[in-house]
């Protein structure tokens, strides 16, 4: 699923306008431009948006490549210590699902946490996808 930049968690209208002015309208375009450090730095220079924020959004866009991961769930994954597809593929479903439950109980980021079988499907898909983010 493709998301408009305004739909990326934490972007908001002001940042969305800056990203659109820089030619980035979707999550896929943000990931493409910001997968490498040089791209993130160039976008930071062009828009004045903090490199830290750009990296966070790019990491979320990386996670959106997984079926079932959208803006809120990407936020939950990040809060549970999973920033990227590359990180997700190394996780154990039972442990990650438990951590997601614990984090969501405190931060209330999503309406529901996926069951272990759903988390396993996400991990399996992550194993099939190429790594995009570089640091």
Regions found by a protein language model. Give the residues of each.
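C-terminal extensions
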Residues: 1-135
């Amino acid at each position: 699923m493709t998301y408009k930049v305004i739909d990326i968690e934490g972007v908001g209208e002001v940042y969305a306008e800056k990203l659109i002015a820089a030619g980035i309208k979707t999550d896929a375009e943000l990931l493409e431009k910001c997968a490498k450090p040089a791209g993130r730095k160039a976008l930071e220079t062009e828009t004045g948006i903090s490199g830290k924020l750009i990296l966070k959004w790019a990491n979320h866009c990386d996670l959106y490549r997984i079926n079932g991961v959208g803006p809120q769930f990407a936020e939950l994954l990040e809060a549970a210590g999973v920033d990227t597809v590359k990180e997700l593929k190394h996780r154990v479903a039972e442990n990650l699902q438990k951590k997601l439950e614990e984090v969501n109980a405190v931060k209330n980021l999503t309406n529901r946490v996926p069951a272990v079988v759903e988390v396993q499907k996400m991990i399996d898909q992550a194993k099939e996808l190429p790594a995009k983010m570089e640091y």
